[in-house]
Regions:
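N-terminal positive-inside, membrane-proximal cytosolic segments immediately preceding the first
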Residues: 1-32, 40
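Short solvent-exposed coil/turn linkers within tandem alpha-helical repeat scaffolds
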Residues: 47, 86-95, 109, 123-131, ...
Length: 219
């Protein structure tokens, strides 16, 4: 009985293969090509582009460290600046990092709209760098007079990577100060208190004491 059932199963399988052999072969070929294509793309396009973008950005980083911000952004006529690196290699890790550099350069040279554009397009899984980018966005929005957006990004920076005590405490302090300046006194007081609670041994906590005292709140 069991042998007969096995024969039926084998016969059905053979019949299925005979009827759908072409379709199955096509599907398997597509899968193989997709896997092979991704491997080729990763190893023959992405990897070389990453290496090229790092090389291309070297001089721009050097100008950035020297505070030659226009050359860092736009190059020197021979070497690329961050803007060109982003244009040519924006999809690489180095191209992504160039957005952070460019955003800071634009911010420091007073081009706040372009600073926002580059910083919003920057994204990384590195919490330290992402928190710094959020803080720079807060600075840019503050310069543009968009206080609500600035406060949002300052708080986002403080909460994204609180282990970076200086940056997190300072970001939250900026949010508190801007809230106070915007007439949001209650929110400002809560933020000053939060700074003292979360970051007690920082300069931001000392500054918070001063501003709370101005509101007749003493601890």
């Amino acid at each position: 009985m069991m042998a007969h059932e096995n024969e039926e199963i084998i016969a059905k399988a053979q019949d299925f293969w005979t009827r759908y052999q072409k379709q199955i072969t096509v599907v398997l070929a597509v899968v193989v090509l997709a896997v092979g294509g991704w491997y080729a793309y990763k190893n023959f396009i992405v990897k070389p582009n990453n290496e090229k973008s790092v090389d291309a950005m070297y001089k721009a980083e050097e100008y950035y460290r020297l505070d030659s911000l226009q050359k860092a952004l736009n190059g020197d006529g021979i070497n690329w600046g961050f803007v060109r690196v982003i244009k040519e290699y924006g999809g690489t890790d180095a191209g992504n990092l160039a957005r952070l550099y460019a955003g800071d350069c634009y911010l420091r040279t007073g081009d706040f709209n372009n600073a926002v554009k580059q910083l919003k397009e920057y994204s990384t899984s590195d919490k330290l760098y992402q928190a710094r980018a959020y803080k720079l966005l807060g600075d840019a929005y503050s310069e543009l007079g968009k206080n609500d957006d600035a406060i949002e990004y300052y708080k986002k920076s403080a909460n994204h990577f609180p282990e970076d005590l200086h940056n997190a405490a300072e970001s939250l302090l900026f949010a508190a100060l801007l809230s106070d300046r915007s007439g949001k006194t209650k929110e400002a007081i809560e933020l000053f208190k939060e700074i003292k609670e979360r970051f007690p041994n920082t300069q931001a906590a000392n500054e918070s004491d001063k501003y709370l005292a101005m509101h007749n709140i003493f601890n």
